């Protein structure tokens, strides 16, 4: 019975370890924790202060010296933080506010955002182009365009939700639970086979 318990514990540790799909970034948790003095400034929650604290500038200098890749991701607002959204304008202004010059040259190419963790969605193919030799093109060429009726919009302007400029929402997909991870684990059939063999 003790051998069975040991096997179950070992198999469950294999199943639960390392199954989450995570994107590898140059930012470690210790790098982000040393950058915490700047989080209020780059998220816009510093109470309207336009200058970062001395501790923030010191941590930015340390981060650019030890982890330029992580600093670039933070300064270009391309790393999601658990504390809130990064205001890209404030993040790009941080090096100048700390009297370090502009955004480092190494960060200029870091303007592309990271993909969200999880599966890649299927893309819808664009509609086919109408060529001059297709039947649809000859019918379209023979008709004259008509004026479309004006849409019913109020004279005040468009109605609908307004967005705040400078704040970019980040969609964070839910992480799979332990049950979902273990059901897709390749070690699950091995666990069942070992349990059957131990019962024989």
UniProtKB/Swiss-Prot annotation:
Describe the inactivation phenotype: Female gametophyte disrupted development arrested at the four-nuclear stage.
Q: State the annotated membrane topology for this chain.
A: Lipid-anchor; GPI-anchor
Lipid attachment locations (GPI-anchor amidated threonine): 177
Could you say which residues form the signal peptide? 1-20
Recorded hits in SUPFAM superfamilies, A to Z, give:
Bifunctional inhibitor/lipid-transfer protein/seed storage 2S albumin
Q: What's the protein here called?
A: Non-specific lipid transfer protein GPI-anchored 16
Q: Where is the composition biased (Low complexity)?
A: 140-163
What are the GO cellular component annotations? Answer: plasma membrane; side of membrane
Positions of the pro-segment in this chain: 178-200
Membrane-spanning residues: none
Please give the tissue specificity annotation from the record for this chain. Expressed in seedlings, preferentially in hypocotyls and roots. Also observed in siliques.
Tell me which residues are glycosylated.
87
The Gene Ontology biological process annotation of the record reads: megagametogenesis
Q: Where in the cell is it found?
A: Cell membrane
| Pfam families assigned | LTP_2 (PF14368)
What disulfide bonds does the UniProt entry report for this chain?
27-72, 38-56, 57-98, 70-107
- Give the gene that encodes this protein: LTPG16
Q: InterPro entries this protein is in?
A: Bifun_inhib/LTP/seed_sf, Bifunc_inhib/LTP/seed_store, LTSS
Family to which the UniProt record says this protein belongs = Belongs to the plant LTP family.
UniProt function note: Essential protein involved in female gametophyte development. Probable lipid transfer protein.
């Amino acid at each position: 019975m003790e051998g069975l318990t040991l096997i179950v514990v070992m198999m469950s540790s294999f199943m639960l370890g390392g199954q989450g799909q995570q994107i590898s970034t140059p930012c470690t948790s210790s790098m982000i924790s040393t950058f915490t003095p700047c989080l209020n400034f780059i998220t816009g929650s510093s109470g309207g202060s336009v200058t970062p604290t001395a501790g923030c500038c010191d941590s930015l200098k340390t981060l650019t010296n030890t982890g330029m890749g992580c600093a670039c991701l933070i300064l270009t607002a391309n790393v999601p933080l658990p504390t809130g959204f990064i205001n890209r304008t404030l993040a790009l202004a941080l090096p100048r506010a700390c009297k370090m010059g502009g955004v480092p040259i190494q960060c200029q190419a870091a303007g592309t955002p990271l993909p969200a963790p999880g599966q890649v969605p299927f893309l819808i193919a664009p509609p086919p182009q109408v060529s001059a030799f297709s039947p649809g093109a000859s019918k379209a060429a023979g008709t004259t365009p008509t004026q479309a009726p004006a849409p019913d919009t109020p004279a005040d302007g468009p109605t609908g939700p307004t967005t705040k400029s400078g704040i970019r929402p980040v969609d964070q997909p839910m992480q799979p639970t332990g049950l979902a991870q273990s059901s897709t684990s390749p070690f699950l059939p091995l666990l069942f086979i070992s349990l059957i063999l131990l019962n024989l």
